[in-house]
Amino acid sequence: MSTTTATPAGADDTVAAARTYQVRTFGCQMNVHDSERLSGLLEDAGYVRFDEAGRPEGSDAPVEPDVVVFNTCAVRENADNKLYGNLGHLAPVKERRPGMQIAVGGCLAQKDRGEIVRKAPWVDVVFGTHNVGSLPVLLERARHNAEAQVEILESLETFPSTLPTRRESPYAAWVSISVGCNNTCTFCIVPALRGKEKDRRPGDVLAEIEALVGEGVLEVTLLGQNVNTYGVEFGDKLAFGKLLRATGGIEGLERVRFTSPHPSSFTDDVVDAMAETPNVMPSLHMPLQSGSDRVLKAMRRSYRQSRFLGIIDRVRSSIPDAAITTDIIVGFPGETDEDFEQTLHVVEQARFSSAFTFQYSPRPGTPAATMGDQIPKRVVQERYERLTALQDRITYEDNQAQTGRTLEVLVAEGEGRKDAATRRLSGRAPDNRLVHFALPEGAQAPRPGDVATVTVTRGAPHYLEADDVSGFAVRRTRAGDAWEARQARPEPESTGPRPVGLGLPTLRRA
């Protein structure tokens, strides 16, 4: 294996300038988690994040990063359009800057493989979901060999959580407990791209959480394609409930969330663990997809309406203040008016605090894409509008019912787009609702990561407002200290690129 230290194209060999990078993320929380790893890998190899690299005043230096990485999603058709649209915008930029590199990873890369380079020959690197850790090597190999590198593996090379990371938040963190999925939903391409479920050992998960808390993290979200089948690899069907309870013993960890469970394998033990463990938050994301038993069967979702509503009842009985969110697909092939009415019925009964609603999008390679009776676009659109109107009403009513409640809000950074104009700060309630709150006159603003006690004065359609400052209080936290320390940290200096191995090429899969 050879090792080289690269300099930007055209640079004097005696001057080693650090190359800048930018990661653009599309899709789910798993991709956000993986993007933090991609950033960590690049910084470990000597790259500097583009928005921190700076540009001297009056400088004619390029305003584009040296490396752009797309971490892609393949769940919906517009994901393809978004990627190739972005790549098209970069083509003339790269023509002006031959030393620039473009890499494409994630689920769409795993799916399209060499097709990406055929459609966009200015792309330098294509890597998949199973070899995230190979990015620096592939970038260097592409520069060294002056040709695109396409490397897609069929099984997981390294569990992403073991890779270097650059976390976006000093007070909240994603922790992956598993990757892949053993379900075979007919509309979903993710299992084909992420592979079969692979679980981390509980001790490894807890050790990562303890290390994060030691750095100041106050909240973690446990990640998996189906968190409540966690343990299938090591033969423990109750492993997820045990893991939740174990997080309750980690001193300094105040908030635990998880996403995403599957109704078919959601057990009473998990509900009990949520109710019994104080730092597990009263919020639950439970994907419905459809309220029709006939459609659920066609989707190959191994539960029916009665089981789903039974789970909702069980959660509400044990955790009365729980906010439950969901995913719903409208217009699945063969969905009739009666099927859709069943979905509306479940939404009325379940009273979700919010819902991610999607118009069905056929994905090549999935069984649903070749099913007959694809629903006309105008019918799907009409149903979608009826569903969103119903859910918007329920969300608004539910938010209005929060008026008068006193909540502990984890102060967040960047959650409130109008905070400067409204002179409010923003954060998340225990049930994960967004809260915009006012400060008493002359009060010192809490830091992101601190916890503010506020009283809700208004439930808006998509958030809560807390303008009554009479009971306002702030608890300064180690998470806030961590945020403050990060702000005070000097901008990273350009130390130049570090040696990166070219690696041993694997069989090219295009």
Swiss-Prot record:
GO terms for molecular function: 4 iron, 4 sulfur cluster binding; metal ion binding; N6-isopentenyladenosine methylthiotransferase activity. Keywords: 4Fe-4S, Cytoplasm, Iron, Iron-sulfur, Metal-binding, S-adenosyl-L-methionine, Transferase, tRNA processing. It catalyses: N(6)-dimethylallyladenosine(37) in tRNA + (sulfur carrier)-SH + AH2 + 2 S-adenosyl-L-methionine = 2-methylsulfanyl-N(6)-dimethylallyladenosine(37) in tRNA + (sulfur carrier)-H + 5'-deoxyadenosine + L-methionine + A + S-adenosyl-L-homocysteine + 2 H(+). Binds 2 [4Fe-4S] clusters. One cluster is coordinated with 3 cysteines and an exchangeable S-adenosyl-L-methionine. Residues 482-492 have a biased composition (Basic and acidic residues). Pfam families: Radical_SAM (PF04055), UPF0004 (PF00919). The keyword Cytoplasm applies. Its EC number is 2.8.4.3. InterPro entries: Elp3/MiaA/NifB-like_rSAM, Methylthiotransferase, Methylthiotransferase_CS, Methylthiotransferase_N, Methylthiotransferase_N_sf, MiaB_methiolase, rSAM, rSAM_horseshoe. One of its GO terms (cellular component) is cytosol. Residues 167-397 form the Radical SAM core domain. Its cofactor is [4Fe-4S] cluster. It is an enzyme of class 2 (transferase). SUPFAM superfamilies: Radical SAM enzymes. Belongs to the methylthiotransferase family. MiaB subfamily. This is tRNA-2-methylthio-N(6)-dimethylallyladenosine synthase. It comes from Kineococcus radiotolerans (strain ATCC BAA-149 / DSM 14245 / SRS30216). The lineage of its organism: Bacteria, Bacillati, Actinomycetota, Actinomycetes, Kineosporiales.
